[in-house]
């Protein structure tokens, strides 16, 4: 089992909500392609093997084709979008993450 630990700290109300334009995505089920998706953009997204990726990681590709492909993936329900997390009252949040694998042999830290 893989576990992600993501503590948050804020001087706000302490309730995290999603707000704004998503910059992080996760795509799944792209083996057959997607109508309206650009082949080069889809190939780049496949390289992430279902792991989350940021829009900036596609910066070397044509921006219009990237945006059109992200819209096509979303319409085909093959894209999860992750909007920025903010405190419910708009105050700043500090966030860290640590990922660990818990197996029969023990625990292995996957992040640096």
Where are these regions (language model features)?
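Active-site neighborhoods and metal-handling regions in enzymes and metal-associated proteins
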Residues: 1-112
